[in-house]
Regions:
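Exposed, low-structure sequence patches enriched in small/polar residues
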Residues: 356, 441-719
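Short loop/turn motifs that connect adjacent beta-strands in outer-membrane beta-barrel proteins
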Residues: 187-194, 235-242, 278, 369, ...
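Outer-membrane beta-barrel transmembrane domain signature of Gram-negative proteins
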Residues: 215-240, 379-431, 549-602, 613, ...
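Large, well-folded core regions of big proteins
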Residues: 355-361, 367-368, 374-376, 395, ...
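Alpha-helix capping and helix-loop boundary segments enriched in small/acidic/polar residues
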Residues: 257-259, 270, 302, 351, ...
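Structural preference for beta-rich elements and adjacent junctions enriched in aromatics
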Residues: 17-398, 406
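Bacterial N-terminal signal peptides
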Residues: 4-15
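Extended, hydrophobic alpha-helical segments in both membrane/secreted and soluble proteins
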Residues: 247, 265-271, 279, 285, ...
Length: 719
């Protein structure tokens, strides 16, 4: 407890010690304004800036480094122009590069990794609320990545896909690009003249340089539009009805599944309707997720359930509408203990097996100062189990520019023997400074034939240039139950804290920053009369400008087990009090290199014995079109009761025939289960947001062999 308090006091006391940007940076940012020029004839989007209309627009330039030399002028010049007509916003950019033949293009697939190679990104804050934004990113190969940034870049929805076009061209003095973004792809105020927040980001990978048009401090994302400039000059723009219908048909052969017919064909419909310029309705009928990639296997040496991330597109869209708390976008302790909304509870069994979804509705967006999220989904009956109806609702209101509050409800209703589970709660967020946020939320559960319970969290988050801190408290009653959340264990209270000090070299250096930090957490029962877990540790890191990094850590753990738990195939750790130490080191190489990889080694005491874990990964980029990667992991556990070894193997091949046609293969082996899993996906984008998928899934284990070949065709109709 004393150590946790010391971390909090130290971090808060040093908040004001963080270096402020130079005084002239605010003046530069205030002057960052560019006008879009109206044209009457659409341009030809081919990546070559040879249309006469481009001469009508005044170019804007002068990008400022975010990395490595914060706020210095970028070493590569970038010029950007803006045009528009009745239907489209056009963006043309010339990115000068002294050796364009050495540009780095790592991938061509949709939603490529944006910062691991050369690239350009356009950030639009269309409501000019200085909090939320659209992002449109490309690379010299013309790949597309689009996303939504929320809460000043702290949350990012890379699964949002809009209709837009980009083409690029590499030339002797650099590379150029042209965007065409339909106004109906965007949401913006219904007013005669538009003024949007604007920023642009460029990655010049060989120079290890990230720069933005309007200067952004290096500790923040380029989606932090509190630091954006202004795009003006757009008049009489209309977002249109923004009605999208996407019918789909599926078919396939499934051999070896006890609950699925050998051959099956089906169809369904997805709908998206922009009710207002800021509020959208999504509907889905006969929802299908057959094209979703398989979960990555994990080694579990703990007594808790594993956490698998959501991969289904429908649930990944508009995540900020249902996210509660400041830590939901990270791997913090508080997130592992209590996640207020976990969409994998819908349409998936406890073992990750699909449960058919009849359909659902989702309403998300803004109405005045309110942010609204409403979703309802219905699953089918499975054998003797009736289907469930799930409801998720959250309404947030900005009380002031720095204070917001929300109320939320999550529920499951069924006609079976377990008829309902309902959770209601509220949340408060404060942002007293750009780098400091405070949260608090509480919720109460009601379950049929069971007593109700409480759960909640308070926390503080500091993201300074030199000082970073997380601290707070999590409480979960023993009687609390949440069928739409992730609760690692009940009947606990956890204090957690983490402080990191970043040290940045002065003058030229290959190192971006060094970090040293400490963390402490203490968990007791919910009455705080019995200590359950205490973990304290130190962390060290060296982060290089070329994206390579070295990390090391050491932890000391106290555990008070009131009952035994299984570990490995046949062993068990008996009840009792345990104290043990462990440590580890990890390295990741330059991610933009043709050959990259890394490793992690950890080990030490483990309950009554010892354990050691080694993980290695390697990625080989043959070209912008083809890349292969491999991951190997082995954990060896030695206990007085016996020993065991757990192995994981992952092999991946990504082949992008073009920015609109891809082949992905993912093969995994889980040694603990003696199971091979294969997933091969072919994806052709035959028109914007319209896909053809061919998917092969295979599972082989001593008790099960299952093979499935699936076909899915989607066709977007936009009005």
């Amino acid at each position: 407890m004393r150590l946790a308090s010391a971390f909090v006091v130290l971090a808060v006391a040093t908040t004001h010690a963080a270096a402020a940007p130079p005084a002239d940076i605010d003046a530069i940012r205030a002057a960052k304004r560019v006008d879009a020029v109206r044209i009457t004839t659409p341009i030809v989007v081919d990546g070559v800036l040879d249309d006469e209309a481009w001469a009508l627009a005044e170019p804007t330039s002068d990008f400022y480094q975010q990395q490595p030399a914060e706020f210095e002028l970028a070493t590569r010049r970038t010029e950007v122009r803006f045009l528009y007509d009745d239907e489209m916003l056009y963006v043309g950019a010339m990115l000068y590069e002294p050796e364009p033949e050495r540009l780095i293009t790592n991938e061509l697939k949709r939603d490529f990794g944006g910062s691991s190679g050369d690239g350009f990104g356009l950030i639009l804050d269309t409501f000019h609320d200085r909090r939320n934004a659209y992002g449109f990113i490309t690379n010299p190969g013309g790949a597309q990545r689009d996303s939504l940034g929320y809460e000043n870049g702290r949350r990012n929805d890379a699964n949002w896909h809009g209709v837009w076009t980009v083409r690029t061209s590499v030339r002797g003095d650099g590379w150029s690009l042209e965007y065409a973004i339909p106004f109906k792809t965007l949401r913006f105020p219904d007013s005669a003249a538009q003024e949007w927040g604007l920023n642009m980001v460029r990655w010049a990978r060989r120079a290890n340089e990230t720069s933005t048009w309007s200067p952004v401090p290096r500790q923040f994302s380029h989606y932090n539009v509190a630091y954006a400039g202004m795009l003006s000059g757009i008049a009489q723009a209309q977002p249109g009805r923004n009605l999208q219908l996407k019918p789909f048909v599926t078919g396939g052969v499934d051999r070896g599944s006890p609950n699925t017919p050998d051959r099956d064909a089906d169809g369904g419909l997805d709908l998206k309707w922009g009710i207002t310029s800021s509020l959208a309705l999504d509907a889905t009928w006969r929802t299908d997720f057959s094209q979703v990639e398989a979960d990555e296997q994990q080694i579990n040496l703990t007594r808790f359930s594993l956490f698998f991330p959501e991969k289904r597109e429908f649930f990944l869209e508009s995540p900020a509408a249902f996210q509660i708390g400041l830590l939901e976008d990270s791997n913090e302790t508080a997130r592992r203990e209590l996640l207020p909304f976990f969409s994998r509870r819908i349409g998936l069994s406890a073992r990750g097996q699909p449960i058919p979804v009849v359909g659902g509705l989702r309403l998300t967006g803004r109405a005045g100062r309110q942010t609204i999220g409403l979703m309802t989904m219905r699953t089918e009956d499975v054998e003797e189990r009736p289907g469930d109806t799930f409801v998720a609702t959250r309404v947030a209101r900005e009380l002031t520019s720095t204070v917001s509050a929300s109320g939320f409800y999550f529920g499951r209703e069924s006609s079976g023997t377990d008829p309902f589970n309902r959770v209601i709660g509220s949340e408060l967020r404060l942002r007293p400074a750009r780098t400091l946020e405070v949260e608090a939320f509480a919720m109460h559960s009601s379950t049929a034939n069971q007593a109700g319970g409480w759960a909640g969290r308070t926390g503080v988050r500091l993201d300074g240039a030199r000082h970073r801190m997380r601290a707070g408290y999590v409480h979960v009653d023993d009687a609390f139950r949440h069928d739409l959340g992730f609760v690692r264990r009940r009947g606990i209270g956890t204090l957690f804290s983490r402080y990191t000090r970043a040290i940045r070299p002065t003058g030229p250096s290959r190192v971006k920053e060094y970090t040293i930090g400490g963390q402490y957490e203490a968990t007791a029962n919910d009455r705080w009369d019995r200590s359950l877990t205490r973990v304290g540790g130190l962390t060290f890191g060296t982060f290089f400008n070329n994206t390579a990094e070295v990390r090391a850590w050491a932890n000391s753990t106290y555990e008070n087990l009131d009952e035994s738990f299984p570990v490995g195939p046949v062993l068990a750790v008996p009840a009792g009090v345990y104290r043990y130490e462990d440590a580890g080191v990890a390295f990741d190489s330059n991610k933009s290199a043709a050959l990259s990889g890394g490793f992690e080694l950890s080990g030490g005491e483990f309950w009554t014995g010892r354990q050691r874990t080694a993980t290695a990964n390697m990625r080989l980029r043959f070209s912008a079109n083809v890349a292969a990667s491999a991951t190997l992991a082995r954990s060896v556990v030695d206990l007085p009761e016996g020993s065991f070894t757990a192995d994981l193997i992952g092999l991946r091949l990504d082949w992008s025939f073009s920015p609109r046609m891809f082949l992905n293969s993912f093969v995994q082996y889980n040694g603990e289960l003696d199971t091979w899993l294969s997933n091969v996906r072919y994806n052709l984008i035959h028109r914007p947001l319209s896909d053809i998928y061919v998917v092969w899934n295979e599972t082989r284990s001593p008790t099960l062999t299952r093979r499935a070949l699936l076909l899915k065709y989607t066709h977007l109709l936009a009005f």
